[in-house]
């Protein structure tokens, strides 16, 4: 399998020169380690060291005949805890949107009387041990109806309440939606509703869905912050930029209400984009296209720098996989770009972990400050409606009279 990996990269890699690496020598260097591998995980490690010599993004390995322990599902409530007065207190209930069933947690369901600040005291009648991780009491309870004992006080007494909930097995989507909504609300508050916020998680199907869903809810804002930090890539996001760069072709006058801009699915105000080093592949290309289109400033940190792509290659004999880059990006001026470097910001803002752990976001704050300036100096102002015409007995154009 080691030799197959070496051959697959030799035959499928997008550049015949293998990025200048002496590929036969790498086979000798790392091949001597194979005899010392005692598990498939060991072999994956050696294969990873081999292909890392190419210094190329999207060079993957994994899977195969691996040994894995049996996992047990853990029920989750979609909330945060803190240890207080010898008991676990619920400090935050994550809520992404009551309209989205995937973004509504167990504690946000109708009839569930649990609030932030309540203490979680018992699970199915068994008192919660404050010396252990609270999740240990939820092992095997995912998707099952569970009785919670909660109270405003850190003790079980006559005021404690019994509440039935159904824990979920994965709360990542709930927390994801909650984070987006918190950012959107923060931007709304800090700009008096003048600036919109859109988060794009990747450049695949989910990213396109999220972009469109959030765009149409905020296209009436004077300006937009497009956040693509941690963008996982997927496809080349030309359609994303086409939506953000769609010009108005005309307006429609109506007797009642505000005149219509056309096409209706467009936004003409200033924009900016948030980027960081955890956005890559399509997440490298998205800000690059955004900048090429002249849509606005890039704010944050340089992106990951992985703009090569995969188009398929053989798997290994035990169904393990290797991913070989089969095509790579270069610019229209005939120079290599982005791969191995990333897309640079126009305004560099370094994250401060000490602030972020408490909910702060220096990059988002910088984007808000920038956009408030942009809408004042470069805001979009639609044309005034022309004077109502007099068409009494004549055509509109001179030759029609």
Question: What does each of the following model-derived ranges do?
Answer:
Residues 20, 34-91, 157-183, 368-369, ...:
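Extended, small/polar residue-biased N-terminal targeting/export presequences
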Residues 3-10, 27, 31, 48-55, ...:
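Amphipathic, well-packed alpha-helical segments that form the structural scaffold of globular domains
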Residues 5, 50, 198, 335, ...:
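A residue-level signal for conserved active-site and pocket-lining positions in enzyme catalytic cores
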Residues 220-222, 331-401:
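In a subset of proteins, long, contiguous C-terminal domains/tails are tracked
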Residues 1-34, 38-49, 60, 341-342:
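Sequence signature of WD/YWTD-type beta-propeller architectures
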Residues 71-130, 205, 327-328:
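PDZ/PDZ-like domain segments forming the peptide/carboxylate-binding groove
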Residues 1-10, 185-186, 279-281, 316-348:
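Metal-dependent DNA phosphodiester-chemistry modules and their immediately adjacent helices/loops
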Residues 8-14, 18, 100-107, 121, ...:
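Cleft-lining beta-strand/loop regions that shape enzyme active-site pockets
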